């Protein structure tokens, strides 16, 4: 579960390295976000020559979480880090590559491109 003030790693090649959650979207008084949900983040560290700059406010989708996710067959999948991919204001993926493992639960109509950008799907 990701809440406000949580630091997250960026798992794509957009240029950001570390981001901080400033708002959990999709609810008026929602406190936590899980895998697959969209949050508002601010960039804390970024690569030197990239489109993403420090202190830039963007949207992001959570792709990995330490708390994990429970599947319908009863298995629980947890990760070692909290990771996101950065989105623009129209909620489209900025990057051209995604690093690390992606869950197949993230495949939906809106983010079908996400599965093709990653090389490892569980």
Curated annotation (Swiss-Prot):
GO CC term, one of those recorded: cytosolic large ribosomal subunit
Any one GO biological process: translation
GO molecular function term, any single one: structural constituent of ribosome
Pfam families associated with the record: Ribosomal_L14
Keyword Lipid metabolism: no
InterPro entries referenced in this protein's UniProt entry, alphabetically: Ribosomal_uL14, Ribosomal_uL14_bac-type, Ribosomal_uL14_sf
Record's keyword terms, sorted: Ribonucleoprotein, Ribosomal protein, RNA-binding, rRNA-binding
HAMAP family: Ribosomal_uL14
Quaternary structure annotation from Swiss-Prot or TrEMBL: Part of the 50S ribosomal subunit. Forms a cluster with proteins L3 and L19. In the 70S ribosome, L14 and L19 interact and together make contacts with the 16S rRNA in bridges B5 and B8.
Similarity remark: Belongs to the universal ribosomal protein uL14 family.
Function: Binds to 23S rRNA. Forms part of two intersubunit bridges in the 70S ribosome.
Name of protein: Large ribosomal subunit protein uL14
Organism: Carsonella ruddii (strain PV)
Gene for this chain: rplN
């Amino acid at each position: 579960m990701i809440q406000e003030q949580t630091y997250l790693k960026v798992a794509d090649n957009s240029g950001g390295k570390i981001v901080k959650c400033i708002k959990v979207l999709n609810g008026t008084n929602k406190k936590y976000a899980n895998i697959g949900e969209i949050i508002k983040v601010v960039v804390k560290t970024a690569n030197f020559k990239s489109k993403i700059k420090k202190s830039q406010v963007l949207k992001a989708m959570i792709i990995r979480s330490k708390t994990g996710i429970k599947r319908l067959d009863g298995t629980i999948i947890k990760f070692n880090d909290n990771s996101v991919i950065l989105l623009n204001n129209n909620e489209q993926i900025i990057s051209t590559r995604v690093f690390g493992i992606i869950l197949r639960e993230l495949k939906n109509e809106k983010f079908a491109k996400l599965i093709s950008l990653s090389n490892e799907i569980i």
